[in-house]
Curated annotation (Swiss-Prot):
Key words of the record: Ribonucleoprotein, Ribosomal protein
Family assignment from sequence similarity: Belongs to the universal ribosomal protein uL13 family.
Protein name as it appears in the record: Large ribosomal subunit protein uL13
Record text on subunit structure and interactions: Part of the 50S ribosomal subunit.
GO CC, alphabetical: cytosolic large ribosomal subunit
The organism of origin for this protein: Stenotrophomonas maltophilia (strain R551-3)
An example Gene Ontology molecular-function term: mRNA binding
Example GO biological process: negative regulation of translation
CDD domains: Ribosomal_L13 (cd00392)
Phylogenetic lineage: Bacteria, Pseudomonadati, Pseudomonadota, Gammaproteobacteria, Lysobacterales
Matching InterPro entries: Ribosomal_uL13, Ribosomal_uL13_bac-type, Ribosomal_uL13_CS, Ribosomal_uL13_sf
Function: This protein is one of the early assembly proteins of the 50S ribosomal subunit, although it is not seen to bind rRNA by itself. It is important during the early stages of 50S assembly.
Amino acid sequence: MSTFTAKNETVQRDWYLVDAEGKTLGRLCTELARRLRGKHKPVYTPHVDTGDYLVVINAEKIVVTGKKLQDKMYHRFTGYIGNLKTESLAQALERHPERVIETAVKGMLPKGPLGRQMYRKLKVYAGTEHPHAAQQPQVLDI
């Protein structure tokens, strides 16, 4: 008996709809990253993208515990001297709420070409509207 290895052509990828309203940021994102990698499937293979497509709605209604809204900071550097841009989680949620979930999930995925391929299967939207009705996503309760 030989060890089973999933092939990229034979992997079945489903579409799921996740409502982020009232969910804790970290707990939701760890489960999203797990499902993007495909670790919830019995055919999981580390070097093959076996994960599903995830559509996350209501990203603007995500919840964090403690004082993270003021204390958690996001940094980005333009490359110019003295141009380190910093914003708090509250400011980031106000400006672009979908990017908060995307950043958290991206940090939990592998770095490299396979991780980028997994990340492309995540679709995050601030409100309840999304353009993926044709894919008929199943509602996933996390």
